[in-house]
Amino acid sequence: MDLYVSSYAPSLSALIRARERARTQKNAPGYANVISFAAVGQAQPGGGQELRELPEVEREIHRIRDETNMPPDMTFEIVTGDAATIEGAIQAFREHRWVHLACHGAQDADKPFESWFAMRDGPLTLMRIIQERYTRSEFAFLSACHTAVGDASTPDEVLHLAAGMQFAGFNGVIGTLWRVDDAIAHEVVTRFYREMFKRPVIDFEYAAEALNVAVVESAKEVPLEKRIVFVHIGI
């Protein structure tokens, strides 16, 4: 980690599309370096989902707002509780360039488009996400379990949640390889955004490097196997 920065791509074509999309976005009239950012968190999923409460979700999101030196001109919307529904999340995806998602998530290896994030009124499936068009989206941080896990038997054929978000229109995505420890997630997430926001020009294309910095900075407090749960995909 001290010698190189890791980033992955579901396929070469996905990487090419993301680069072309990012170039088009940045060259579009009216594009400005003022980031519109939404944090979507669901601590108490409903809709018949039998999932444990996630009491640390609100704390994670408020640490992003309060402890990362967020630029004062950044638009930051918090979508939690009753507002963090399927349609509430989709609206945040449509309206903001960056999205942070803190909730339960699960991969369905047999039916990858049925993989989901748990919202207040039920599961937000990958199929539902890709039905929309996201012209503004640039970057998504998926602070949920198993969002970048494929299938060991067919690693090149399974569309996991992080790859699906890139396919839907997010040029860069951070996902997780296994269950996320809440306390560790808080530290890595806070350090990641602090690193992103300290640059004179805030750009989502710095995400892979910022994640590497956050993971390395956590080395003294966090064991390696828990630090490397987060991976960057795309650009």
For the regions a language model picked out, list residue spans one by one:
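Catalytic cores of enzymes
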Residues: M1-I235
